[in-house]
């Protein structure tokens, strides 16, 4: 059973999605120093269910994603880490908090490209891009450009569509826990469509009702 250094965050990391961190807390600086001695250099990311990223004492969801370290820079100030989401896992047991969080994990089964319905994949892409395009017309900041380039691999693309979808963290966590790729695509379409209806309804209210 793999033992993995863990970095709980206030956001969800999906496979095939980038992750940029500014690390300043002492225990995570120690963690980064430790994992750089391993190949591949990786750690686990789980969503914090209750609590804060800094200081410990938080409660965490049990399904997360491994992050492979691509680059580390140490300018004057916090450590800057660039990583990429790789494989999903389930936490079996938290085994340590010092010198940094660690957990026994089991990897979740990877999806197969042959299982991807290309029609559903195309619909998910048009739905997510459509929602981003609508939000771009409002005075709202969106984390991803509407014309963002996605992977050619259908599994990676499905995860990336979930990752860039304009949803809250709990919706993202639900998508991360998808039991199969067809579920991932259908629920991405459904959840983003429902969110878009909410966005439009809120934006269509008269100014004195918003």
Language model feature labels by segment:
Residues 1-210:
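N-terminal low-complexity, acidic/polar interaction/targeting segments
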